[in-house]
């Protein structure tokens, strides 16, 4: 029978059953991130460097190869917001309009001495009825205005010839007859006076009768019948503008000739009645003007 072993104490058993615990780990020592300056002197230079970089960026933003001078921007500026007592009442006839309200009403050039848009539409429809293709009607109107520049825009003229387009033609009498019936030849020619003016200068083609009308070579284009409407803003404007502008000498020459012609045509206006008892069957006396003292100098 084997010998009995003495029982171990409870403390020894418990010490054998429990595992050995490792010693506590030493906490890691934090290391500074790379590039971090630990010196006090280096940390003091950071604000100065930032200011230097900010100044550099500011100077770069201010430099430019473009510099706007004499700036004045009225169009597109922010609209003012008047106070309630200054907004006015637009329903009151005595309301005082502001500058912005006047600016909102755009001007529309208009002249009662030239053909209106409605007149031109009626002329277009009438010429279509005579057989002129729609796409060539504007060209026919141009031809009529160029024709009248050398003849006359008077309704009493006896026109000759035809106006042509590719594949067709129409008698000048028919075109001018319809234009006179609807709007008047002179009123239509005035509407296209700037276009005719540019056309004559592009082709170096002044009115044919300029010499017989008494115009000097330097003002020969003033013999144009509708010269006084070349700079009218209500007329049809060339795409490139009116070139060249009429000169002062041309205005003087045109108005002088216009006065002479009107006096010659209006000699019967001296009569208050055209009955034979008044006129005696004769034309009125010639209206004369003394131009010698026009410049306030006796000659």
UniProtKB/Swiss-Prot annotation:
Task: State the UniProt keywords alphabetically.
Answer: Capsid protein, Helical capsid protein, Ribonucleoprotein, Virion
Q: Which InterPro entries match?
A: Carlavirus_coat_N, Pltvir_coat
PROSITE patterns linked:
POTEX_CARLAVIRUS_COAT (PS00418)
Does Electron transport appear among the keywords? no
- Regions of biased composition (Basic and acidic residues) lie at 35-46
* Recorded GO MF terms: structural molecule activity
Q: Where found, per UniProt?
A: Virion
Report the domain of life of the source organism: Viruses
Chain spans, region Disordered: 1-46
Which Pfam families has this protein been placed in?
A: Flexi_CP, Flexi_CP_N
What's this protein's family per the entry? Belongs to the potexviruses coat protein family.
Describe the function of this protein. Required for genome encapsidation. Forms ribonucleoprotein complexes along with TGB1 helicase and viral RNA.
This protein is called what? Capsid protein
The taxonomic lineage of its organism, from the top, reads: Viruses, Riboviria, Orthornavirae, Kitrinoviricota, Alsuviricetes
